Amino acid sequence: MSNKNNLRYALGALALSVSAASLAAPSEAQQFTEFWTPGKPNPSICKSPLLVSTPLGLPRCLQASNVVKRLQKLEDIASLNDGNRAAATPGYQASVDYVKQTLQKAGYKVSVQPFPFTAYYPKGPGSLSATVPQPVTYEWEKDFTYLSQTEAGDVTAKVVPVDLSLGAGNTSTSGCEAEDFANFPAGSIALIQRGTCNFEQKAENAAAAGAAGVIIFNQGNTDDRKGLENVTVGESYEGGIPVIFATYDNGVAWSQTPDLQLHLVVDVVRKKTETYNVVAETRRGNPNNVVMVGAHLDSVFEGPGINDNGSGSAAQLEMAVLLAKALPVNKVRFAWWGAEEAGLVGSTHYVQNLAPEEKKKIKAYLNFDMIGSPNFGNFIYDGDGSDFGLQGPPGSAAIERLFEAYFRLRGQQSEGTEIDFRSDYAEFFNSGIAFGGLFTGAEGLKTEEQAQKYGGTAGKAYDECYHSKCDGIANINQDALEIHSDAMAFVTSWLSLSTKVVDDEIAAAGQKAQSRSLQMQKSASQIERWGHDFIK
C-alpha cells in the first residue's frame, strides 16, 4: 500500500472509529509508525495555510525538540526571578511577556486580560506547641500544616472544640452553622472537624464568633480521612485569622484534653493583587463555532514549573505559532491561564465574565496540564464517565474518543483520568461546555499495570518533582512530551476542521437537557476539590 493510500485509509478508518461507541485500533497501525516518526516534518506543509487540511499535518509539524526550546526559555525566566514563575511575581510577568511577544511575532492579536486575585506564599514552616497543661511540640507536615490562603498569625490561646462528631462513619457538620459557636469565648482557638461544608465557611464562622485562630482537623469518618492533605480556605477567604490543618488523631486528643492551651505560628504572605491571562485566536475560522485550547502559565512558588505547567504552555505556544497562517474552518482560541495554582482563578474569571452568547460560541474546550511527566502515563479526561462515573457536559465523550483514536493510531495505550476539578477545565464544566484534554500524572503512584503499559517504575510517583524546586528541564520526559503534544495537535486540528462529532452528541443529549442540567448542578454542588487543594 502506498504512503498516499496509507494516509487515505487512516483518515477514513479514523473517522469511522471516532463515531463508533467502541474504537478498535486500525488494522494497519504498524504501517503508520513510519508516518508518525518524530523528526520528519514537511517544511512546505508546516508553513502553509494548508497545515490543517487534514488532522495529520499539525501533529507531524509539532516537534518536541521545538517545545523543549520554549521550555528552556521558561526555565531561564525562572532562574532570573527567584527560581519560580508564580502568579503576580516578576517571573510570571516575564512569562506573560514571552508568550505575548512570541504570538505577536507570529502575527496574532493578543489580549492580556487582568483579573484580581489573592496572592498567597508560605515564607516558612509553621509551628505548633502546647503550653498548658504540659509542654508538647508538634511536628510540621506530620502533625499539622497550613490551609492554603490562611492569614499569617502568632496566637497563644485556649482551645475550644466546636460541635464535634468523632468516630468512624461520622457525618460531621462541625463549624458549618453560626449556631455551632453559641457561647464561644472570644479570643480562643476554635477546634473544628472537617465535614459537610467547605473550609472557608467553617473558618469565617469561627472568625465571626471572635476566634483568634482556627485548627481544622481531618474528619476521621474513613481511613483515608485521617492524615494531612492539601487543603484551602479559598482565595476569597476574608476571616482575617490564621487557620491550620491537623490530623484526625491529634484533633481527637486535643478535644479530650481539659484546659488545653496551644501556641500556633503561621508564617505566610497573603495580599490582594492582580495578574493576567493571555488570550489569542486564529485570524480565520468561524467565530461562532470556537475551539478553545488552554494551559496554565503560572508555576508554584516553590519551583520553576517546567512540567507543571510549562509543558502544556510551551506545547500550546508552539502549536499556536504553527497555526498562525493556517486556514481552519472553525476559529481556534488559545488561552494561557494565570493563577491556576491559586485555585483556577484565571480560567474561572474568564468563563464567568463571558456574556451568555459568547459562551455559546465555544463548542469545545481542550485542557493541557502536565504533559511531560518523567514516569508518565497516557491519561485522557474521562468525558463519558465510563471509568470514574462523572460524565462531562454533552460532547465531552466525543472529545475523549478523538484522543483515544489518536493514541490507537500511534500504537499507544491510554486510559481515563478522573474529572476531579484540579485543572482549568473546571469552570467550563460548570458552564456546560464540552471539554477534554490530557494529563501525564502528578503526585500519584504508578501501578504495576501502568508500568507494563507505559514503561517506567511501578510504586513511584508519575512526577516526583511535582510542585518542587526540581521541576526543571531535566524533569521532562521527551517521549511523553512528543506523544502528548502530537495528540493535542491532532484533536485541535480535527475540531478546527469539523465539530460534527461534538455537535451530534450535543444534539442527542438535547432531549435530556433538563435532567442533564440538574445532574450538572448536583455535580457542581458536590465538588470537593478546586485546583490542587481540597476545598472541603
UniProtKB/Swiss-Prot annotation:
The record marks 466 as: Transition state stabilizer. It is an enzyme of class 3 (hydrolase). GO terms for biological process: protein secretion by the type II secretion system; protein transport by the Sec complex; proteolysis. Zn(2+) 2 binds at residues 308, 341, 467. It catalyses: Release of an N-terminal amino acid, Xaa-|-Yaa-, in which Xaa is preferably Leu, but may be other amino acids including Pro although not Arg or Lys, and Yaa may be Pro. Amino acid amides and methyl esters are also readily hydrolyzed, but rates on arylamides are exceedingly low. Residues 152-255 form the PA domain. GO terms for molecular function: aminopeptidase activity; metal ion binding; metalloexopeptidase activity. The active site is at 340 (proton acceptor). Processing of the 56 kDa pro-protein to mature protein requires elastase (lasB); in vitro it only occurs at greater than 55 degrees Celsius. Several forms of the enzyme have been identified by molecular weight, exactly which part of the sequence they correspond to is not always clear. The AP58 form may be subject to proteolysis to give rise to AP56. InterPro entries: M28_fam, M28_SGAP-like, PA_dom_sf, PA_domain, Peptidase_M28. Its EC number is 3.4.11.1. Mature protein inhibited by dithiothreitol and Zn(2+) chelators such as 1,10-phenanthroline, EDTA and EGTA. Not inhibited by serine-protease inhibitors, N-ethylmaleimide or phosphoramidon (which inhibits elastase). It comes from the Bacteria. Optimum pH is 8.5, active between pH 7 and 9.5. Keywords: Aminopeptidase, Disulfide bond, Hydrolase, Metal-binding, Protease, Secreted, Signal, Zinc, Zymogen. Residues 1-24 form the signal peptide. GO terms for cellular component: extracellular region. It is found in: Secreted. Zn(2+) 1 binds at residues 296, 308, 369. It holds the Pfam family PA. A secreted aminopeptidase. Acts on free N-terminal amino groups with a very strong preference for Leu- followed by Met- and Ala-, and no activity on Glu- or Gly- peptides (an exhaustive analysis was not performed). Both the AP56 and AP28 forms have activity. Belongs to the peptidase M28 family. M28A subfamily. This is Aminopeptidase. The gene is lap.
